Curated annotation (Swiss-Prot):
GO terms for biological process: microtubule-dependent intracellular transport of viral material towards nucleus; symbiont entry into host cell; symbiont-mediated suppression of host cytoplasmic pattern recognition receptor signaling pathway via inhibition of TBK1 activity; symbiont-mediated suppression of host JAK-STAT cascade via inhibition of STAT1 activity; symbiont-mediated suppression of host JAK-STAT cascade via inhibition of STAT2 activity; symbiont-mediated suppression of host toll-like receptor signaling pathway; symbiont-mediated suppression of host type I interferon-mediated signaling pathway; viral transcription. The lineage of its organism: Viruses, Riboviria, Orthornavirae, Negarnaviricota, Haploviricotina. A motif (Nuclear export signal) lies at residues 49-58. Residues 138-172 are annotated as: DYNLL1 and DYNLL2 binding. Belongs to the lyssavirus protein P family. The keyword Phosphoprotein applies. Keywords: Chaperone, Cytoplasmic inwards viral transport, Host cytoplasm, Host nucleus, Host-virus interaction, Inhibition of host innate immune response by virus, Inhibition of host interferon signaling pathway by virus, Inhibition of host STAT1 by virus, Inhibition of host STAT2 by virus, Inhibition of host TBK1 by virus, Inhibition of host TLR pathway by virus, Interferon antiviral system evasion, Microtubular inwards viral transport, Phosphoprotein, Viral immunoevasion, Viral RNA replication, Virion, Virus entry into host cell. Non catalytic polymerase cofactor and regulatory protein that plays a role in viral transcription and replication. Stabilizes the RNA polymerase L to the N-RNA template and binds the soluble protein N, preventing it from encapsidating non-genomic RNA. Also inhibits host IFN-alpha and IFN-beta signaling by binding and retaining phosphorylated STAT1 in the cytoplasm or by inhibiting the DNA binding of STAT1 in the nucleus. Might be involved, through interaction with host dynein, in intracellular microtubule-dependent virus transport of incoming virus from the synapse toward the cell body. InterPro entries: PP_M1-like (IPR004259), PP_M1_C (IPR037199), RABV_P-like_C (IPR049506). This is Phosphoprotein. Signal peptide: none annotated. The modification Phosphoserine is found at S63, S162, S210, S271.
């Protein structure tokens, strides 16, 4: 009786073909499930639809008048953007601010800069207040009636130095309120392209570029880290350091900078290795303590 010998490579090739066939079948099944995913959900009951869905209607096939369409569009815009007369404006405004806070947290977690987020948020809040809290009608008439008298007074009297100082202080307070919360010390000077400030920051960082700073590590020990380990260009480090609250003001005054706080800030934003090794909660406290100590001097 003759024996039939099978080449092992042929067996391996056959097994590979079987595995590929199984993977192909699985892929086809997944595609079918994905394409039919909308059919697997629970049916929607008409009674459970949102209130806005009740405004939907079917056209009867007749083309509406363009003027009527414009009126409907304007009314819909006012209805969506303005609050109802029967609702409490303060409660709606509080709900709006809560939503704004949630949106800010999401944007910060996604990596966006706080200054950019805050400037956009301020504009949105101002537009919301301007639409939903308009000036009382009596105020505009008073302004018109006092316009002529105001012009005559300007010709006769000029503001004293004390009045100018009070006006400038009020303007500074208004600018500070619009730019952001004062506790965070996010000032508009962080965005200025001041070459002398950048030169001062670069000078102090370059002097301590190789110096090791102590940071809390996740292993309950000490993590030694310096600016060299960032492997970044000095210009990029300076640009990132200007975002640290209070650093621009200290550099403009020629004061000493909290370099450990600056290093921690830049490393957290640009070094994944540093993020894995450092204890973030303790680091935040250390950075805040350094910042408070240097800015209070």
């Amino acid at each position: 009786m003759s024996k039939i010998f099978v080449n092992p490579s042929a067996i391996r090739a056959g097994l590979a073909d079987l595995e590929m066939a199984e993977e192909t079948v699985d892929l086809i099944n997944r595609n079918i499930e994905d394409n039919q995913a909308h059919l697997q959900g629970e049916p929607i009951e008409v009674d459970n639809l949102p209130e806005d869905m009740g405004r939907l209607h079917l056209d009867d096939g007749k083309s509406p008048n363009p003027g009527e369409m414009a009126k409907v569009g304007e009314g819909k815009y006012r209805e969506d953007f303005q609050m109802d007369e029967g609702e409490d404006p303060s409660l709606l405004f509080q709900s709006y601010l809560d939503n704004v806070g949630v949106q800010i947290v999401r944007q910060i977690r996604s990596g966006e800069r706080f200054l950019k987020i805050w400037s956009q948020t301020v504009e949105e809040i101002i537009s919301y207040v301007a639409v939903n809290f308009p000036n009382p009608p009596g105020k505009s008439s008073e302004d018109k009636s006092t316009q002529t008298t105001g012009r005559e007074l300007k010709k006769e009297t000029t503001p004293t130095p004390s009045q100018r100082e009070s006006q400038s202080s009020k303007a500074r307070m208004a600018a500070q309120t619009a730019s952001g919360p004062p506790a965070l010390e996010w000032s508009a000077t962080n965005e200025e392209d001041d070459l002398s400030v950048e030169a001062e920051i670069a000078h102090q960082i370059a002097e301590s570029f190789s110096k090791k700073y102590k940071f809390p590590s996740r292993s309950s020990g000490i993590l030694l880290y310096n600016f060299e380990q960032l492997k970044m260009n000095l210009d990029d480090i300076v640009k990132e350091a200007k975002n640290v609250p209070g650093v621009t003001r200290l550099a403009r005054d020629g004061s000493k900078l909290p370099l450990r706080c600056v290093l921690g800030w830049v490393a957290l934003a640009n070094s994944k290795k540093f993020q894995l090794l450092v204890e973030s909660n303790k680091l935040s406290k250390i950075m805040q303590d350094d910042l408070n100590r240097y800015t209070s001097c």
